[in-house]
Amino acid sequence: MSLVTALIRRRRHRLLGRLVQEALALYGMEVPAACEIGPGLLVYHRGFGTVLHPYTTLGAGVTLYNGVTIGRADPWVPQEESAMRRVVVEDGAVLCAGAKVVCKEGVLTVGAGTIVGANAVLTRSTGPGEIWAGVPARKVGTRAGWEPGYTNGSRPVPHSGKRTSHSPSPSASSVAPAKP
């Protein structure tokens, strides 16, 4: 477990909570005590610039890279009047560097095993095992071989690393002929 992950786990400590919050702030992280975080959280690059809204739930085995933001799409509205209720990031999801997940209204759910690409701006819920990218984010593929389920208590079942995409396959002219 990394130092940052250990600090995140201890942010609700009765006596040390405030000190832990300040230590996380030195890393540029804002993880309120109200956030619900499941086991097996992985934070890469010390999470520099990561900000989570207090109404955030992270499932088991979630991976966060640096610069991830989870929050409201209407920050100018007082919290009590906001249509946003919660952001739920389900088990095994990966939020890549600079990903923004912003909820307009109700509950926004990032499906189990979903990957949100670098610098993507996700404003709607996703299904399980999907790959989302772009601004605004749109579905660009699915995680081939990804299946829900966990081993060792917290890490996702490995997948083949391949993905299926909606983009056309390479043309026949771009594929080298097989050697005899």
Spans of model-derived segments:
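Terminal amphipathic alpha-helical/low-complexity segments used for targeting or macromolecular assembly
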Residues: M1-G28, G129-E130, V135-P180
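Regulatory activation segment
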Residues: P78-R86
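Short, ordered loop/turn segments at secondary-structure junctions
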Residues: P75
